[in-house]
Amino acid sequence: VTSYAPDDRVMVSPRYMAGAGDRLADAIGPLIHLFGWSTQHDAATGHVAIDSPDGSVFVDFNPIQPLGRWWTIAHHEPYWEVQFSRQTPLEAVAAATQALPQLLGDTRHAERIPITDMPLDQLAALNGWSVEDGVLTSPDWCCQLRHTPNEDIVWRSEHAFFEKPPLATFTRDVPEGLVRNFFAHLTAPMAVERAFADVPLSTRFEHSDLITPVRGAVISPHVDHALAQLDRPGRRR
């Protein structure tokens, strides 16, 4: 078993086992710098509030939210809401936040920020997830995206090893493009980079084979990680 210092950079896959990570700028930076959304930042608490130019959407990041619901995206008329937890990979959060301007009709930078049109069941099959009775389940059974069309929350992503709240919730009337983009980046097979201290405890201690070091990679961190996963036991095909 490899020993890591807290600040060692490591590669982790699958992404839903990697925790949030530290690339907060990817989730909020494009809205501010590319699309001119207004922002308020409380340096003492880390709270960030971002509003769309027309005032129809706001994005709220609150890292001291007591229930761990760090992210809220809300739209007015019709009202819909998306929430992400403190363990949701920022790659998946950013895939949703960066899609917001385009979904509101601002097509600038659309070529740089694609919104996938692949149906969710095809995305699941592409990445080895199973689909049954409205539930999309990861190959290792650790993560699910559940569709409950008759409830107020119509999509819910949950993780077997993380405490509540869910990784993500989507209420009725959320554009499905947001759900697709989130799911595409949650299930993508490419490993993500983390500081070891940011990797969830359950992954560090119970699934340490999912972690490989960045430093000392023979080919590249991504390739070395992929090769290390080829013979990992317990993978459902």
Residue ranges and their predicted role:
Residues 1-237:
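Compositionally biased accessory segments in Actinobacterial proteins
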